[in-house]
Amino acid sequence: MATERHYSPLDRLLLQADTAMRTLLPFSGQPARPSPAIIQPDAELDEQQTRHIAGLMRINHTGEVCAQALYQGQALTAKLPQVRKAMEHAAEEEIDHLAWCEQRIRQLNSHPSVLNPLFYGMSFGIGALAGLVSDKVSLGFVAATEHQVCKHLDEHLEQIPENDGKSRAILEQMRVDEEHHAESALEAGGYRFPAPVRFGMSLLAKVMTKSTYRI
């Protein structure tokens, strides 16, 4: 029977640094699943459509950077081993989304946001603080965040042209995964945040979306 490996605080910090580099450096994240866009044909898009879709995908990419940092921060301070493992597993799935979005951004001749390091640091700190409060709050924060992401994905799917099958396939699969993460966090005992807290989180999300659409 395999024994679970126990990491020292230094080991965990080094792992966090490695994850941060793989999240922020171009083409560093290797997805476990192939991009859903692979089987979709190329679409004929005009310059304005291409620029707008690239902006939306840049927002989604930064959202995945934030999710990765959030999960890593929570995993660092989670009190129960099973909660820590759940956070780490969710972070691994977010790597897929991160890589898929970056691939699509490059295909559209654009680039990820230069603000990603800033948002990574902020999200990591929020995640670590949530984990320090309690695992229940930490899991609740995951659920609220993922529900907010699903809302953004729905809005973006309404804006992306029907003939852009590549972008739509990526966002549709992300939508399925994020909803699963949210429900799993609640089923694990996550706290359901009240409306005022969710509203505050939505305001912070708007800061991210407005700033990363162009840069």
From Swiss-Prot:
GO terms for biological process: ubiquinone biosynthetic process. It is a peripheral membrane protein. It comes from the Bacteria. Its EC number is 1.14.99.60. InterPro entries: COQ7_proteobact (IPR047809), Ferritin-like (IPR012347), Ferritin-like_SF (IPR009078), Ubq_synth_Coq7 (IPR011566). It catalyses: a 5-methoxy-2-methyl-3-(all-trans-polyprenyl)benzene-1,4-diol + AH2 + O2 = a 3-demethylubiquinol + A + H2O. Fe cation 2 binds at residues 94, 146, 178, 181. It is an enzyme of class 1 (oxidoreductase). Fe cation 1 binds at residues 64, 94, 97, 178. Binds 2 iron ions per subunit. Keywords: Cell membrane, Iron, Membrane, Metal-binding, Monooxygenase, Oxidoreductase, Ubiquinone biosynthesis. SUPFAM superfamilies: Ferritin-like. It holds the Pfam family COQ7. GO terms for cellular component: plasma membrane. Its cofactor is Fe cation. It is found in: Cell membrane. GO terms for molecular function: 3-demethoxyubiquinol 3-hydroxylase activity; metal ion binding. Pathway: Cofactor biosynthesis; ubiquinone biosynthesis. HAMAP family: COQ7. Catalyzes the hydroxylation of 2-nonaprenyl-3-methyl-6-methoxy-1,4-benzoquinol during ubiquinone biosynthesis. PANTHER family: 5-DEMETHOXYUBIQUINONE HYDROXYLASE, MITOCHONDRIAL (PTHR11237:SF4), COENZYME Q10 BIOSYNTHESIS PROTEIN 7 (PTHR11237). Belongs to the COQ7 family. This is 3-demethoxyubiquinol 3-hydroxylase. The gene is coq7.
